[in-house]
């Protein structure tokens, strides 16, 4: 772009017809050097910013910088099971993720769920007696799992009128930390609104060495 500073790598020199020195510059070489330098800084567990570029059924692709694309698999988006990555993120959304794996071909796999807190950290944000909005994630014979935070879901009584993805209002009947269970009561199943929880980060920088959801 005119007027914008740009990096190049000098690959050689020559002379023009008047004898003046002409420098042979490569923008591509500068981009490769930038990419390699950036990759050298990335380690498994590193928390980095990224931007969602496109979404597939199996995950979301993200730009992690210097034009480097990484995969955020659907099962790494949160502890709660979702039908599609689009239930959690949108194209253009900026995220914080941790590097789950980087192989010898510099293919990078990301994870988001480890940054969204353990069961205890999420449960501490709620209290029995509250009424909150949740998203139905699974309807089973023995009950309905309803997400009240990306890494936290509770169980309500069976209800065949509910379906995955439905937004409902729920009353928190009890929170049982020793059993890691939350009992919910659906109080309004007709909210008629599509909802997606925004990420609530419990980790925003540094490097993850280990993570146990049940702690």
What residue spans do the PLM features occupy?
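Single-stranded RNA-binding regions, centering on S1/OB-family and related RNA-binding modules
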Residues: 1-215
